[in-house]
């Protein structure tokens, strides 16, 4: 005789607990090809994230300031559901979406407490790629 399967474990849906976070950190990774925005709490636990490519921009349109603005607004709205009011911004990379992402977060009504550039600078480490000849 077949054993009755335990469907109660499969039917149990884990409800996501919304924690209330007043202050957070925005990590903006702006490369030449894409912009990745991650909003975390002070401990580094991710609350929200968005990318230019995830907002529907493909190809060369991903690397525009407007795509970074749309991604920042999307991540900012999700973070506001967690009760985020103040944000510290950490920008990494040389991409075109650096400034527009910060402006978009400020436009949502979130207070920007600090802006810092955390772009890694090598102390003459790896050899860089060869220069482009157009």
From Swiss-Prot:
Description of how the protein assembles with itself and partners: Part of the 30S ribosomal subunit. Interacts with proteins S7 and S18. Binds to IF-3.
GO molecular function, one term: rRNA binding
Any one GO BP annotation for this protein: translation
InterPro entries found in the cross-reference section: Ribosomal_uS11, Ribosomal_uS11_bac-type, Ribosomal_uS11_CS, Ribosomal_uS11_sf
rRNA-binding recorded as keyword: yes
Functional description taken from the UniProt entry: Located on the platform of the 30S subunit, it bridges several disparate RNA helices of the 16S rRNA. Forms part of the Shine-Dalgarno cleft in the 70S ribosome.
Keywords, sorted A to Z: Ribonucleoprotein, Ribosomal protein, RNA-binding, rRNA-binding
Gene Ontology CC entries for this record: ribonucleoprotein complex; ribosome
Protein known as: Small ribosomal subunit protein uS11
Family indicated by similarity: Belongs to the universal ribosomal protein uS11 family.
